[in-house]
């Protein structure tokens, strides 16, 4: 019996050449709507779906393949006598190949002017039903949903006259991944439209971007996936201009650096190591900002990741060229800067559209046996809600330093303390199990620069001991959430030493 293929695609990439190859193998082709029209326009002889179903395409194409003659031909088990007998009695013929991809729902809802009606109209019904039927019966049916697989199938047909069982199984698995991702997009879209923030089930879908050499350590396997609607201002959508392939750790660090530099509207440069900032500087131009970020910690920046929120010019590139760095991220690089930096063959250069998110996206964190979902911490300092419980208020310069430290401290692993002075960080204490321990690290790093600096703490002071350490170091202004039952003790210490202290009412833990 002559083999048959059913071809109905939204993405018509390569379909004419593929169908031509099927016809050359003596395979009869059934097609629908726009696909049939395209194939016939290219001189290929195909059978209309209505000739198989005996029923016209109706309701603007909503009903065309939902018919027993189609699904009987797909689902019949060819070595089951009962199935074969029923097919013969009902005049059905088997379908051996299904070439289908689905209505472009993702592309439709990505349009800024999409209406709800447009989105609904682009939910495919017949397509998923066909490919699921074919995939279930993959022992007898080859189902192709991705143009990438056209050449593989044709090559096996030409060489062996059939598609290998292992290939059919792989294609079937791809179908169910495809429909699961498709349904996830639809369910998430409808859930968002209804304003449901915590549905009873959560299905997420990501698209493979690249295999990585290894994970956090060489013995760990890793892959990088991107969200289907990831912000263009993200590592997932970065353009790599130069250098080695990004590693797992590179991607994590680049993401951390990008998150911090987005906090600033003025020219700013961030240096990151192990997802913590080691130096942050702002200035009148990007060269000045980089100089301050470097001077913040000229030791830790070695082998680090740099993110800038302005174009890298030649002068800045020459300074960057002086030390070993893993990555430099910027909105753009001047041609002269590229020529300087590309002389380092392994240095990764990334361009990213750097803009702060206008709304909080969801952050997913896996734990053993589950998944935590929360909003990203995008909250900025609101000066209308702060309070100043101390006798002295911050000076204009202290306010400037406090704001810089506060922008940075929310991105430092808790317990977090950041010291800032004169448009740059001068000390970062990260990840200690007690707050005073982080303060001591930041103060030690700052050294004599701590005198007259500002301190930011990501959470309140449970004891006044951190304030005592700050006072001994000559720190003159502090910003913290407040809210401890011992706030009065801290306020008394601050007043004793003439320290200005600001309560924000907002905590910025980061684990």
UniProtKB/Swiss-Prot annotation:
InterPro entries: AICAR_Tfase_dup_dom_sf, Cytidine_deaminase-like, MGS-like_dom, MGS-like_dom_sf, PurH-like. Pathway: Purine metabolism; IMP biosynthesis via de novo pathway; 5-formamido-1-(5-phospho-D-ribosyl)imidazole-4-carboxamide from 5-amino-1-(5-phospho-D-ribosyl)imidazole-4-carboxamide (10-formyl THF route): step 1/1; Purine metabolism; IMP biosynthesis via de novo pathway; IMP from 5-formamido-1-(5-phospho-D-ribosyl)imidazole-4-carboxamide: step 1/1. Keywords: Hydrolase, Multifunctional enzyme, Purine biosynthesis, Transferase. One of its GO terms (molecular function) is IMP cyclohydrolase activity. It catalyses: (6R)-10-formyltetrahydrofolate + 5-amino-1-(5-phospho-beta-D-ribosyl)imidazole-4-carboxamide = 5-formamido-1-(5-phospho-D-ribosyl)imidazole-4-carboxamide + (6S)-5,6,7,8-tetrahydrofolate; IMP + H2O = 5-formamido-1-(5-phospho-D-ribosyl)imidazole-4-carboxamide. GO terms for cellular component: cytosol. It holds the Pfam family AICARFT_IMPCHas. SUPFAM superfamilies: Cytidine deaminase-like, Methylglyoxal synthase-like. The keyword Transferase applies. Residues 1-145 form the MGS-like domain. One of its GO terms (biological process) is 'de novo' IMP biosynthetic process. CDD domains: IMPCH. Its EC number is 2.1.2.3, 3.5.4.10. SMART domains: AICARFT_IMPCHas, MGS. Belongs to the PurH family. The IMP cyclohydrolase activity resides in the N-terminal region. This is Bifunctional purine biosynthesis protein PurH. It comes from Bacillus cereus (strain ATCC 14579 / DSM 31 / CCUG 7414 / JCM 2152 / NBRC 15305 / NCIMB 9373 / NCTC 2599 / NRRL B-3711).
